[in-house]
Amino acid sequence: MEHFAQIRALVSQVKSPHVRALLDAFLDDPELQPAFLKAPAAMRIHHAYLGGLCEHTLSVLQLGWRICDHYPQLDRDLITAGCLLHDFGKVRELSPEPGGGYTDEGRLVGHIVTTCQLVREKAAGIEGFPRELEWRITHLIAAHHGRREYGSPKEPVTLEAMVVHALDDLDSQMSAFALLFQAAEAGAAWTDRKNQYGRALAVAQPAGTDDRRFGGQGLYRREMD
């Protein structure tokens, strides 16, 4: 619940009443909220453990806020919306049960389309929600995989969409590397080269530790079967 409380704290600072109402509609949904707290962010590769989706979402959100401090031309409310919602549909795409795999909705529709549908549904329930704002938020979700060959129905065409894609990819790669470090033998300087990258990776050794494999912000958890 600590991660969820931190997400709430960031969302509470959204200035646009329409964006705030939309994000609250997701976070307050009695079906979506418990699923969001429990869901993994993936079946393998990154944040592949119970609660991984909430952890990944918070990390991307925190990165988004730091980026907005550095680049004031970014719309912080849109960045917050994109970072929070980009993977929200995974609550319906992935089974939270160990070994559960993909749901039928996940296989037939996928989390990007599911999230876009949820945005349309939630926005329709908010009086006076601007249609163009809905389109821009939907674009953040539709474009967050970056390229069509990676599953994005649209490629980023706004600054905010480019940033959400980049931060999602960065946080996913950090978790993926961490899981490979964990799988390495104790004291090993390199991972096995049989991984999704097709190459051995130099194992990071966090300051103040004797074991290269461990350290970081909860990233070294066991992935789901």
Indicate where each model-derived feature is located.
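Acidic-glycine-rich active-site phosphate/pyrophosphate-binding loop
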Residues: P30-L37, F88-L94
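Extended, charge-rich intrinsically disordered regulatory tails
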Residues: M174-A178, A183, A188-D192, P206-D210
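Acidic, low-complexity intrinsically disordered tails
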Residues: L201-D225
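Short coil/turn segments at secondary-structure boundaries
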Residues: R20-F26, F36-A41, S95, S152-V157, ...
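Divalent metal-dependent catalytic cores for phosphoryl transfer on phosphate-bearing substrates
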Residues: E55, R66-A184
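Extended, charge-rich, solvent-exposed interface segments
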Residues: M1-F36
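Active-site flanking loop/helix segments enriched in acidic
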Residues: P34-E55, G99-T103
